Structure formats: structure tokens, C-alpha cells
């Protein structure tokens, strides 16, 4: 238990414990429903978890402001002092959250010189690291817009841009602010700025730029997604190809999942060379060691194989069929379903004697028959059956098909 307390020697008053962490509260605060929580726990619940209900009462928290419960905090401190002989450590008095006016002054003063800008960013980094309440205060004071302006306009000073980019990511800004940044056309477009950093930036900045671009494009409306420039696709694919970090790779893949449902974007992604890069990734054990990466990769391949250019690029890669076939029944239901959809797309629209023979030799037909036999999603089975029936004349009586699979072949 917290503070080195021996629970067999001393009983902790239950109202000293945070309802979330069940540990002694170090900084008790009251939410709008009247329940007291430890600040760190409720901030994680509200901001990191993006929940807006009270964990105890389940009522909506209408006001995100947290009111310090000074009376309870002093009572806990007194209790800690009285029980020091039992090994109870006194909780320190927490520092008060930063105020909005102080932040606004900090931003105003930074405009006077480059040195003041550097000092401002250092102070902001310190404030961000203290608690989530400070992050919300910085957001209210316009810090995300201030940082985005540096990222967009201060290309001559790489270190300043890198620091602003780092801070902007760690602010964990709300969807509303992300939309404002995306819609702000007064300064340089934030998507364009992040794309440039992904192209020219240092290692860490490329990672943060990719993570930020993912967050921003998640709140984009369909028209904003459909009008993305080809350079965005080029740099996202380059991030995947460079494999600079697992975080960046997953973020880049997530971006493609979000923007490739739109027809125009599929063509841009194919032209950027994403299909061959994804197939190479699917052959990389470090990428396939976790389920989510291969799942997203299969989703993107499925989306891109819905256009003729995508199917052509897919079949241009010598390992494509084998790699996709291998993921069926090996990763997850989602991955299996998307893999079968990819094979159905190429089998329906690109069937040639050579392709059908290749699919037979690589075990695709046997794998599809297996899908029909095992516990698998109904839609996945339907698509597997559709592909098998489509080419039954070629596949069903082939000596390449194992005898035990011939019995499973749909009539």
C-alpha cells in the first residue's frame, strides 16, 4: 500500500482513498457531481481516457474544472503526521495548477526575441510535464495555436521547430482544437507543414510529425480527406518504408486506414508505392509480432485492391499472394476477413490461367477450403465460398489440391 503502510497495524479511513486508484489521495479534488478523487487519477480518466462521466455516480461531468478539496487534503496530511511512527509518509502540499493569464503573458513576451521564444518553450515543457490540468489550461490559453504557428513558419530554426512539435504532441489536445488547427488557413496549412517535417526532419521530429498528422486527420471531414495532396501519401509511405519506429509505423498505417476509403485517395496511395511497402512489412517479423499492425495492413490492401490500379500493383509483387494467404487464420478474424477479400478482388477481376495456377500452388485454394471448415466469421466464409465456386472448374479436380480439402470444396 502507498506510503509504506502496514495494513495489519493501521486502518486507513476509507474516505482518504481515491475511488479510482484505491490509494491515499495526494491531491484530492472535487468534480461537478460532488465526488472527490485524486487529481492524477481523475485527470487520466477524463482526459487520457476521454470519458465524461463520474466513475462513482455515472452522471455526466458537466464542468471539467476540478476544485481542490483543501479540507480533506489537510485532514489526510494531519493523519499522516499522527501515524508517522507506523511508517506513514506525509503527503506534500501540491503545487497549484498554472493560471491562464500567466501562460498568455508567457506567449506575449516570447514574441520580442528568439531567446525569449526558447525560454518560453522550455517553460511550457516544464508546465506540460506537471499534470493534465496544466495541459487543459495551456489549451485554453491558445498554446496549441502558438506552437502550430512555430511549426508552420519557423523553418529556418530547426531546433525551435522540433521543440514546438514535441510540445504540441505531448499536449494531447482535444478534438476541437485539432479541428481548429486543421481549419486554420491564415497561416501555413498544418498538414503541409507536418508533411515537410516528415520529409526533411530529424528522426524524432519525423516520428512526432507522423503521430500528430494521424491525430489531426482523425478529425478531418470527408472533403478534407479527399483533397489531401499527393505529397502526404508519399511521405506516409516513406515513413512506413524507413521503419523509423514502431509508433511511427503504426501511426502511418492508421493514417492510410482513415484516408484510403475515398476513391481518389486510393489512386494517390497506389501511385505513392504503398502496396509493395506493405507487403514487405508483412514479411517483417518485428511488424507482424503484434496483431494490430497486420490487421491495419490487410485493411489497407483490401481498400486499395478495390481499384484496378491497386490490383495491378498488388499482382506486380511476386510475394503478394503468398503473404496474404499466410495471414488467413493466423492473425485475427479481422485480418482473415480482409485477406479473403483481397484474394476475392484479384480472383474476380484479374483471373488468368497463370494466376489461378499460382493460387493453387501457393495453397490459397486449400486455405479457403479450410476457412469453410473452421470456426470463422460468416461473411468471411461467404467470400471464400464465392471465390472457390468462381474457379471450381480449374481448382476442384486439380491434383494439386490435397484430398482432404476436396471434400470441403463447395459444389
From Swiss-Prot:
InterPro entries according to UniProt: ARM-like, ARM-type_fold, PUB22/23/24-like, RING-Ubox_PUB, Ubox_domain, Znf_RING/FYVE/PHD
ARM repeats (start-end): 132-173, 175-203, 221-261, 263-306
Phenotype when the gene is knocked out: Increased tolerance to drought stress.
Domain spans labelled U-box: 11-86
Subcellular location: Cytoplasm
One cellular component (GO) term of this entry: cytosol
UniProt EC number: 2.3.2.27
Upregulating conditions: By cold, drought and salt stresses, bacterial elicitor flg22, and bacterial and oomycete pathogens.
Catalytic activity: S-ubiquitinyl-[E2 ubiquitin-conjugating enzyme]-L-cysteine + [acceptor protein]-L-lysine = [E2 ubiquitin-conjugating enzyme]-L-cysteine + N(6)-ubiquitinyl-[acceptor protein]-L-lysine
Phenotype upon changing residue 45 to A: Loss of autoubiquitination
Protein species of origin: Arabidopsis thaliana
Gene: PUB23
Protein name: E3 ubiquitin-protein ligase PUB23
Amino acid at each position: 500500500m502507498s506510503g509504506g503502510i502496514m495494513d495489519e497495524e493501521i486502518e486507513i479511513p476509507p474516505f482518504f482513498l481515491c475511488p479510482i486508484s484505491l490509494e491515499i489521495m495526494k491531491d484530492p479534488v472535487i468534480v461537478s457531481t460532488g465526488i472527490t478523487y485524486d487529481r492524477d487519477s481523475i485527470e487520466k480518466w477524463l482526459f487520457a481516457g476521454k470519458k465524461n462521466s463520474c466513475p462513482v455516480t455515472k452522471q455526466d461531468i458537466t464542468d471539467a474544472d476540478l476544485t481542490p478539496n483543501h479540507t480533506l487534503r489537510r485532514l489526510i496530511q494531519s493523519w499522516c503526521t499522527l501515524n508517522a511512527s507506523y511508517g506513514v509518509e506525509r503527503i506534500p502540499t501540491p503545487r497549484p495548477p498554472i493560471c491562464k493569464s500567466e501562460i498568455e503573458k508567457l506567449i506575449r513576451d516570447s514574441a520580442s526575441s528568439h531567446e525569449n521564444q526558447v525560454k518560453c518553450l522550455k517553460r511550457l515543457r516544464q508546465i506540460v510535464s506537471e499534470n493534465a490540468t496544466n495541459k487543459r489550461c495551456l489549451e485554453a490559453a491558445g498554446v496549441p495555436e502558438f506552437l502550430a504557428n512555430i511549426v508552420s513558419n519557423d523553418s529556418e530554426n530547426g531546433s525551435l521547430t522540433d521543440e514546438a512539435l514535441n510540445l504540441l504532441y505531448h499536449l494531447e489536445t482535444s478534438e476541437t482544437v485539432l479541428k481548429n488547427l486543421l481549419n486554420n488557413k491564415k497561416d501555413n496549412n498544418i498538414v503541409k507543414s507536418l508533411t515537410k517535417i516528415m520529409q526533411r526532419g530529424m528522426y524524432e521530429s519525423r516520428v512526432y510529425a507522423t503521430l500528430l498528422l494521424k491525430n489531426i486527420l482523425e478529425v478531418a471531414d470527408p472533403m478534407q480527406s479527399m483533397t489531401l495532396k499527393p505529397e502526404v501519401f508519399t511521405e506516409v509511405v516513406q515513413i512506413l518504408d524507413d521503419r523509423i519506429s514502431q509508433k511511427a509505423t503504426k501511426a502511418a498505417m492508421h493514417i492510410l486506414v482513415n484516408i484510403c476509403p475515398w476513391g481518389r485517395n486510393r489512386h494517390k496511395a497506389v501511385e505513392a508505392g504503398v502496396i509493395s511497402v506493405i507487403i514487405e512489412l508483412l514479411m517483417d517479423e518485428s511488424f507482424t509480432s503484434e496483431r494490430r499492425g497486420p490487421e491495419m495492413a490487410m485493411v489497407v490492401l483490401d481498400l486499395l485492391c478495390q481499384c484496378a490500379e491497386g490490383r495491378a500493383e498488388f499482382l506486380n509483387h511476386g510475394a503478394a499472394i503468398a503473404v496474404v494467404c499466410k495471414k488467413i487464420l493466423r492473425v485475427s478474424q479481422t485480418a482473415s476477413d480482409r485477406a479473403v477479400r483481397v484474394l476475392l478482388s484479384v480472383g474476380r477481376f484479374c483471373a488468368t490461367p497463370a494466376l489461378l495456377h499460382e493460387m493453387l500452388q501457393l495453397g490459397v485454394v486449400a486455405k479457403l477450403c479450410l476457412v469453410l471448415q473452421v470456426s470463422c466469421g460468416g461473411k468471411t466464409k461467404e467470400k471464400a465460398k464465392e471465390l472457390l465456386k468462381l474457379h471450381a472448374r480449374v481448382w476442384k479436380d486439380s491434383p494439386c489440391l490435397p484430398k482432404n480439402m476436396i471434400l470441403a470444396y463447395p459444389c
